[in-house]
């Protein structure tokens, strides 16, 4: 019985530590694997992801943050969020930033 409890506890610790490695502790946000150009461009990534965060706060829809970030922000939801955040006048700047984040794909 004691061995089973220890094995269960060890398995839980391994899972918790393993999943914690998937999170960026500096920003406490999930590392987006779809954007290959994030490394070296974290400042751009933070500016673009802020649009999705603002949109999620505006609409409060479950899953909206993921839909906005889908395909490294190259989707219709990101454009909707850009308009909802009243930042559509900056669309050309965001297109350049998104192309940088999508570099290498």
From Swiss-Prot:
Disulfide-linked positions: 35-72, 52-68, 55-81
Any single biological process term in GO: neuropeptide signaling pathway
Molecular function as annotated in GO: neuropeptide hormone activity
Tissues expressing the protein: Produced by the medulla terminalis X-organ in the eyestalks and transported to the sinus gland where it is stored and released.
Main subcellular location of this protein, as a coarse class: secreted
InterPro entries for the chain: Crust_neurhormone_CS (IPR018251), Crust_neurohorm (IPR031098), Crust_neurohorm_sf (IPR035957), Hyperglycemic (IPR001166), Hyperglycemic2 (IPR001262)
Entry protein name: Molt-inhibiting hormone
């Amino acid at each position: 019985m004691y061995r089973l409890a220890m094995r269960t506890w060890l398995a839980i610790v391994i899972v918790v530590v393993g999943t914690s490695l998937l999170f960026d502790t500096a920003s406490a946000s999930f590392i987006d694997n779809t954007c290959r150009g994030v490394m070296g461009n974290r400042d751009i990534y933070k500016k673009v992801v802020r649009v999705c965060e603002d949109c999620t706060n505006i609409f409060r829809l479950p899953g909206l943050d993921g839909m906005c970030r889908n395909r490294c922000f190259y989707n219709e939801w990101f454009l909707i969020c850009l308009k909802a955040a009243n930042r559509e006048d900056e669309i050309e700047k965001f297109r350049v930033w998104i192309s940088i984040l999508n570099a290498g794909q």
